[in-house]
């Protein structure tokens, strides 16, 4: 079975073809980096117009990569939320139009579910498992009991961690997106040079907060007269270290909540998995620290490859396959900007 996946929820236009044997036959991502760079962030209207322009080319390139025709496609899956509504509508309607023209099933995919299930495209891990989903717009601990069966154990009460990376990069005039740039500069800096607040780490549960950290970084930057390269590297290292410490601290509580929740609702596996996914999971320092923590608590730390952590259509196609196999899909769906995984 060959499934086309379409992703357009933010600033990357992506189309992929994945089959039911977990093979990525084609995977095309068209970046909108140059369109948004002058604004140091994503402009929704510009993103939607770029998706409209890029989708047709991306589809053609995907079919060329796969060396197949539309007649070889069985199902169309497209991100239908959450995300920037203009882009979500463009991609979802594009997918529905193709499905209608081909007489094939259309599957509306939750973008976050794509991230949650992406790890199963490369690793045949069984349910249940714990996910730390970290991206530009979301930061959540999720108990994954099965396809479409999710419990949010904790989440950010204000800003997402990816947004904090981008804001810090903007303050330092480093460019966009901020995550990869800060990670690179942090490797040259002293992570203990500046003390930054470990927000909510003393509280029960596993909710998170990054607004206080953002404010502290802003105040720190404005207090320094000369931002030399060494100072910038130290700020990046201290910021990244603090973010990771917050996530590690809250992960400990999340593991306890996950085990409690599963003991009441599911027979937990002998081998437990702690998955980190989402765009920020491409950060190698964060990934390794989460793996180390997972091992300490008897879990196997797992993450999708970096190219499947950032927004991509292969994870959307795979989520479509998972939902099709579970018979959990409907062709009657309206794209939406907000869509919790607990509503699936």
From Swiss-Prot:
Binding, Fe cation: 111, 115, 311
Cofactor dependency: Fe(2+)
Gene3D superfamilies (UniProt xref): 3.30.420.40
List of residues binding substrate: 133-137, 166, 179, 283
Reactions performed catalytically: L-threonylcarbamoyladenylate + adenosine(37) in tRNA = N(6)-L-threonylcarbamoyladenosine(37) in tRNA + AMP + H(+)
GO biological process per UniProt: tRNA threonylcarbamoyladenosine modification
UniProt name for this protein: tRNA N6-adenosine threonylcarbamoyltransferase
Organism: Orientia tsutsugamushi (strain Ikeda)
